[in-house]
């Protein structure tokens, strides 16, 4: 499960990077693409940090950061929806769906981690 989640987070960050290359080039899409690349890669990188957590509290904190970054990514995707060219619709749909699934997984993980204190 750990490697699968890591792979999904890395894949999401890579697909978002590809998506950002296909945006319309407007000021807002340029601005948001930089932000969404940061938030999606942060989620993947923080997953590695969570795997090396020093305590249950540290793990819970790091997983909470992953969830926050994924939620930020979700909102950025919504804001970018008008800037997506026709050739990027599939990438946008994949990123939206995958991000929603990962938010649900990490939301449950945070709840479980907090209840196991």
Which residues fall in each region the model found?
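Short, C-terminally biased terminal segments at protein or domain edges
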Residues: 1-45, 49, 53-117
């Amino acid at each position: 499960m750990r490697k699968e989640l890591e792979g999904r987070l890395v894949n999401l960050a890579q697909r978002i990077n590809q998506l950002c290359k296909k945006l319309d080039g407007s000021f807002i899409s340029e601005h948001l693409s930089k932000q969404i690349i940061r938030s999606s890669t942060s989620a993947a990188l923080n997953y590695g940090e969570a795997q090396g957590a020093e305590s249950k509290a540290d793990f819970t904190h790091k997983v909470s950061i992953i969830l926050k970054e994924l939620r930020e990514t979700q909102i950025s995707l919504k804001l970018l929806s008008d800037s997506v060219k026709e050739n990027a619709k599939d990438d946008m749909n994949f990123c939206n769906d995958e991000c929603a699934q990962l938010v649900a997984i990490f939301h449950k993980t945070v709840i479980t981690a907090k209840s196991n204190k």
